[in-house]
Amino acid sequence: MSGSLGRAAAALLRWGRGAGGGGLWGPGVRAAGSGAGGGGSAEQLDALVKKDKVVVFLKGTPEQPQCGFSNAVVQILRLHGVRDYAAYNVLDDPELRQGIKDYSNWPTIPQVYLNGEFVGGCDILLQMHQNGDLVEELKKLGIHSALLDEKKDQDSK
């Protein structure tokens, strides 16, 4: 990452660590493990990415991300109040890890899917967060971003 994207990701990582660990995730977040039934075939992956409105393939779980980029994705979703999503830990299944890279033709993890469509990784999600596109995409899915409430509260003061 370069410049402002790197600084913003670093700030998110620091914020996430200081926000307190446990109890952040509501009942909607499903750390689904590999969930692919021991494989990463295109048919299985197609079913996984279309199963939920928001699907994330990451290293680790939302409660314990195992890399900074996965942590940043989790924190961005948390900032927006997105709690109902499926999270698949690619570290649990090497076939899933390679399969999702082949499926998306994207070489890195994490990977984010909205309504069955590949969005990108950490850098893309961070950019969408910064420029407001993520709020709009979530709105299309019927998901209200918590940042809208925060902005409304600030505007009323």
Swiss-Prot record:
In the record, biological process GO terms are:
[2Fe-2S] cluster assembly; cell redox homeostasis; hemopoiesis; intracellular iron ion homeostasis; iron-sulfur cluster assembly; protein maturation
Q: Which SUPFAM superfamilies match?
A: Thioredoxin-like (SSF52833)
What the entry lists under InterPro entries is as follows: Glutaredoxin, GRX_PICOT-like, Monothiol_GRX-rel, Thioredoxin-like_sf
Tell me where in or outside the cell this protein is found.
Answer: Mitochondrion matrix
Q: Per its UniProt entry, which superkingdom is the organism in?
A: Eukaryota
Record-linked Pfam families: Glutaredoxin
> What positions does the entry give for glutathione binding?
K59, R97, Q98, G99, I100, K101, I109, C122, D123
Q: Which PROSITE patterns match?
A: GLUTAREDOXIN_2
| Residues modified as Phosphoserine | S156
- Quick one: effect of changing L148S? In SIDBA3; deficiency in Fe-S cluster synthesis; does not impair ISCU binding
Effect in UniProt of substituting K101Q: In SIDBA3; deficiency in Fe-S cluster synthesis; does not impair ISCU binding
Q: What range(s) does the Glutaredoxin domain occupy?
A: 42-145
Q: Where is the transit peptide?
A: 1-31
Q: Which residues bind [2Fe-2S] cluster?
A: C67
The PTM N6-succinyllysine maps to K59
Q: Which UniProt keywords apply?
A: 2Fe-2S, Disease variant, Iron, Iron-sulfur, Metal-binding, Mitochondrion, Phosphoprotein, Redox-active center, Transit peptide
Can you list the GO cellular component terms from the UniProt entry? dendrite; iron-sulfur cluster assembly complex; mitochondrial matrix; mitochondrion; neuronal cell body
Under Gene Ontology molecular function, one entry of this record is: metal ion binding
The entry sums up its family as follows: Belongs to the glutaredoxin family. Monothiol subfamily.
Quaternary structure note? Homodimer. Interacts with ISCU. Interacts with BOLA1.
The record describes the protein's role as:
Monothiol glutaredoxin involved in mitochondrial iron-sulfur (Fe/S) cluster transfer. Receives 2Fe/2S clusters from scaffold protein ISCU and mediates their transfer to apoproteins, to the 4Fe/FS cluster biosynthesis machinery, or export from mitochondrion. Required for normal regulation of hemoglobin synthesis by the iron-sulfur protein ACO1.
Q: Which disease is it linked to?
A: Anemia, sideroblastic, 3, pyridoxine-refractory: A form of sideroblastic anemia, a bone marrow disorder defined by the presence of pathologic iron deposits in erythroblast mitochondria. Sideroblastic anemia is characterized by anemia of varying severity, hypochromic peripheral erythrocytes, systemic iron overload secondary to chronic ineffective erythropoiesis, and the presence of bone marrow ringed sideroblasts. Sideroblasts are characterized by iron-loaded mitochondria clustered around the nucleus. Spasticity, childhood-onset, with hyperglycinemia: An autosomal recessive disorder characterized by childhood-onset of spasticity, spinal lesions, leukodystrophy, optic atrophy in some patients, non-ketotic hyperglycinemia, and defective enzymatic glycine cleavage. Glycine levels in the cerebrospinal fluid are mildly increased in some but not all patients. The increase is less pronounced than in patients with classic non-ketotic hyperglycinemia.
Q: What is this protein called?
A: Glutaredoxin-related protein 5, mitochondrial
Source species: Homo sapiens (Human)
